């Protein structure tokens, strides 16, 4: 059975709907940074999704080819995560999504080193005939955080964020 990060780390991927404290350890990610409305079908965000998932699946399926990664285990690709902000805005201005600046990312298994990531970029570029150079290998060490599950439309996120701010 493939290792599933959502099931094995429920405290990170299936949090309570109430704000709470959690310590998040360092984790490696494939990331792409960009700007603009994520709903624009011709925008940077759509291109970033192709890069992120292209690399995530190149790594996941690497065991079927000749390349061997030390410590490899079969796994379910973790969910997409993102960091969003807008310059000069207090909170989020959903009426102006074109001003979003974002980092979208997918967690990488612990066996993926920078060298393995670089191999995946070269492999995906060669196989898919696309540019994967916008992707970066990054380690995030979040430490102590306030976490809460938001359920509902994006436009109601500010209320969830207010609850988290009040808790903190």
Predicted feature descriptions by range:
Residues 1-168:
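A solvent-exposed interaction/effector surface
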